[in-house]
Amino acid sequence: MNIRPLHDRVIVKRLEVESTSAGGIVLTGSAAEKSTRGEILAVGNGRILENGTVKPLDVKVGDVVIFNEGYGVKKEKIDGQEVLILSEADLMAVVG
């Protein structure tokens, strides 16, 4: 994958989760909730502060994160793979 996010943005590949109903039935497709966990595939250089310095991001390629999929999250298909482009502010936690 040849993509480089700008500034404080990251490229995330959503991790698939297997959802099971209360009765033990495995839910797939539209019946299953979409995961809000993903793996960081690429990171930007960082956020530009008011004084002009660049604050590096707190995440790195390979980190598994929990994210908020709200306004401003862009879905793209790159090399046949769906990825999300989001700001570091949309990341809620690093797992592990």
Curated annotation (Swiss-Prot):
GO annotations of cellular component type: cytoplasm
Localization annotation: Cytoplasm
Keywords: Chaperone, Cytoplasm
Entries under PROSITE patterns matching the protein: CHAPERONINS_CPN10 (PS00681)
SUPFAM superfamilies, A to Z: GroES-like
GO molecular function: ATP binding; metal ion binding; protein folding chaperone; protein-folding chaperone binding; unfolded protein binding
Main location: cytoplasm
Keyword Disulfide bond assigned: no
Pfam families, alphabetized: Cpn10
Origin: domain of life: Bacteria
InterPro entries per record: Chaperonin_GroES, Chaperonin_GroES_sf, Chaprnonin_Cpn10_CS, GroES-like_sf
The keyword Cytoplasm is annotated on this UniProt entry: yes
Alphabetical GO biological process terms: chaperone cofactor-dependent protein refolding
Similarity field: Belongs to the GroES chaperonin family.
PANTHER family (UniProt xref): 10 KDA HEAT SHOCK PROTEIN, CO-CHAPERONIN GROES
Quaternary data: Heptamer of 7 subunits arranged in a ring. Interacts with the chaperonin GroEL.
Entry function: Together with the chaperonin GroEL, plays an essential role in assisting protein folding. The GroEL-GroES system forms a nano-cage that allows encapsulation of the non-native substrate proteins and provides a physical environment optimized to promote and accelerate protein folding. GroES binds to the apical surface of the GroEL ring, thereby capping the opening of the GroEL channel.
Protein name: Co-chaperonin GroES
Source organism (scientific name): Shewanella baltica (strain OS155 / ATCC BAA-1091)
